[in-house]
UniProtKB/Swiss-Prot annotation:
It comes from Homo sapiens. InterPro entries: UBQ-conjugat_E2_core, UBQ-conjugating_AS, UBQ-conjugating_enzyme/RWD. CDD domains: UBCc_UBE2D. GO terms for biological process: negative regulation of BMP signaling pathway; negative regulation of TORC1 signaling; negative regulation of transcription by RNA polymerase II; positive regulation of protein polyubiquitination; positive regulation of protein ubiquitination; proteasome-mediated ubiquitin-dependent protein catabolic process; protein K48-linked ubiquitination; protein polyubiquitination. Component of a E3 ubiquitin ligase complex containing UBE2D1, SIAH1, CACYBP/SIP, SKP1, APC and TBL1X. Interacts with RNF11. The keyword ATP-binding applies. This is Ubiquitin-conjugating enzyme E2 D1. One of its GO terms (cellular component) is nucleoplasm. It catalyses: S-ubiquitinyl-[E1 ubiquitin-activating enzyme]-L-cysteine + [E2 ubiquitin-conjugating enzyme]-L-cysteine = [E1 ubiquitin-activating enzyme]-L-cysteine + S-ubiquitinyl-[E2 ubiquitin-conjugating enzyme]-L-cysteine; S-ubiquitinyl-[E1 ubiquitin-activating enzyme]-L-cysteine + [acceptor protein]-L-lysine = [E1 ubiquitin-activating enzyme]-L-cysteine + N(6)-monoubiquitinyl-[acceptor protein]-L-lysine. It is found in: Cytoplasm. It is an enzyme of class 2 (transferase). The gene is UBE2D1.
Length: 147
């Protein structure tokens, strides 16, 4: 079941990739993918290339894939281990979702952080109190780690 679904998602992704994103298997292991998100235009991450790992559980799509950034990023919802605080990767997961939709959601999280559900409270506080300082730090990290 999982393998068929993953193969279908892969062919859909290759035929119609989501904006600013790409993904595919690492070697021959269809349960382990690498994904790429280009920093969205008009965001502090513009120009950056961010890599993520995608691990599918054997009971996919009934359980969500484990997705994490391998590129360091300054963001209130993404911690230093690359873990992403995004409801659809946890409690709001649905088998109707696809890797493509999840990558687009991560992209929009880069444009619109959720400081009220932070993984990194310090960054969330800066985002809320001094947006210019937040954007400056995010741009610096993008230039340092994602270019």
């Amino acid at each position: 079941m999982a393998l068929k679904r993953i193969q279908k998602e892969l062919s859909d992704l290759q035929r119609d990739p989501p904006a600013h994103c790409s993904a595919g298997p690492v070697g021959d292991d269809l349960f382990h993918w690498q994904a790429t998100i280009m920093g969205p235009p008009d965001s502090a991450y513009q120009g950056g290339v961010f890599f993520l790992t995608v691990h599918f559980p054997t009971d996919y799509p009934f359980k969500p894939p484990k997705i994490a950034f391998t590129t360091k990023i300054y963001h209130p919802n993404i911690n230093s281990n690359g873990s992403i605080c995004l409801d659809i990767l946890r409690s709001q997961w649905s088998p109707a979702l696809t890797v493509s939709k999840v990558l687009l959601s991560i992209c929009s999280l880069l444009c619109d952080p959720n400081p009220d559900d932070p993984l990194v409270p310090d960054i969330a506080q800066i985002y809320k109190s001094d947006k210019e300082k937040y954007n400056r730090h995010a741009r610096e990290w993008t230039q340092k780690y994602a270019m």
